[in-house]
Amino acid sequence: IVSFSLIIRHNEYQRAIFSESASILFGNISAIATDVKNYFRLKETNESLANENILLKNRLEQYELSRDTIVQGTFMQDSIPVYEYIGAKLVNATFNRTKNYLTLDRGLKNGIWKEMGVCSPDGIVGLVQDLSGQFAIVIPLINVDSRISAKIKKNSYSGSLQWDGVDYRYSYLNDIPYHVEVNEGDTIVTSGLSKIFPEGITVGYVESVDKETANFLKIKVRLAVDFKRLDYVYVILNNKKNEQTGLEAINYHE
């Protein structure tokens, strides 16, 4: 070390090289430190934006309720929106299985229950299947056991969306009658014929239509959500689900 120090001290050329190398080294360290800081700042920004989106979605639901009551000439002081949204973050996921699952960092302590719908800003994600106090397991659309009611947006024909276990980017809309007009690029949305998802949330877009079957079309749907890039989601709370379920169970139980 002493010899190295003497060489640097008494040799202008070596001193210049050392100085340049040190500048590059410390410059790289500084750049890495900046990148790390920016990463955590970006993470905080994403969390903040996700929380803001939750507030906006809940306010929109309240606005829609207020608008409907005004249009109908009825004012209800204790009115609450049908749907509310709880923010959550993806902490684990699988993509290469036939029965994929997602894990969220919210659970019973956060007001989440089984069979609550999950969506993202891009569209439908899946359905809450299991819970603990602080976590939730979601069965996503890319699980062969997943089925949701969806419809063609332009004509409201409804069918059942089911994944075939092959490609995480695509699913299939079944039970659409053969005579229905469907074109590539048509938008597929939630039908509203369930107590889980509000009507009109984007599911995906028609990729192709198979007309070879006898009575029904087989519609390949490019899913709106890119599951490999999924990060923050909204868990959907239906405030009137229990009332509807109870009424249907009493009057139409078979």
Provide a role label for each language-model segment.
Residues 1-109, 113-254:
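Extracytoplasmic/periplasmic terminal helices and flexible tails
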